[in-house]
């Protein structure tokens, strides 16, 4: 059986957007900071070939290739600690744009990508697991995102890195049907 954790119904969300030439430095900071974050913080990467028109994306950046680092404070969204944590994570590197807001988890965060991945679309996803997000791994991911993954075509794709931290890592792999808990970095290509 699974145990759910009560929080919300709202959460503090933040996103920072980076062009290719700033992405590597931002991802290196992300890799250095993420392992030390507390359990109530989620911080992930979405490398988009064409940034969708999300509420925090300036109009001139819609449709351009951008790396997005997005964070979630999964505790009291109005707490000073949460506000400062999100601001700290948005200050990583030199973002082209940032935005933060208090949003509903269920109808906000869980539906965040519905427009990009609508019902009926035949999505194909592959996943890899890394124990370390090294400089070489970051270079390979950015190169693949910038030069592959539909670059120069109309193909829309996403390369994502989800850090598996928090309470998910506190449960032994043999105690759950959820495998690969010993791997901090999950890389998804969609």
Placement of each model-derived feature along the sequence:
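Soluble FAD-dependent oxygen oxidases
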Residues: 1-190
């Amino acid at each position: 059986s699974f145990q759910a954790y009560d929080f919300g119904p709202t959460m503090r969300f933040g996103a920072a957007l980076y062009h290719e030439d700033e992405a590597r430095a931002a991802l290196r900071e992300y890799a250095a900071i993420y392992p030390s974050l507390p359990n109530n913080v989620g911080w992930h990467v979405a490398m988009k070939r064409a940034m969708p028109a999300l509420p925090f994306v300036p109009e001139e950046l819609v449709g351009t290739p951008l790396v997005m680092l997005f964070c979630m404070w999964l505790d009291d969204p109005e707490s000073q600690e949460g506000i400062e944590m999100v601001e700290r994570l948005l200050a990583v590197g030199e973002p082209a744009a940032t935005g933060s807001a208090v949003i509903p988890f269920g109808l906000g965060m869980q539906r965040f990508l519905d427009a990009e991945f609508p019902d009926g679309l035949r999505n194909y996803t592959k996943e890899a697991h890394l124990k370390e997000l090294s400089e070489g791994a970051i270079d390979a991911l950015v190169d693949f995102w910038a030069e592959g993954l539909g670059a120069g075509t109309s193909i829309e794709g996403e390369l994502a890195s989800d850090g598996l931290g928090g309470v998910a890592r506190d449960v032994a792999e043999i105690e759950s049907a959820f495998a690969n808990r010993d791997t901090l970095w999950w890389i998804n290509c969609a």
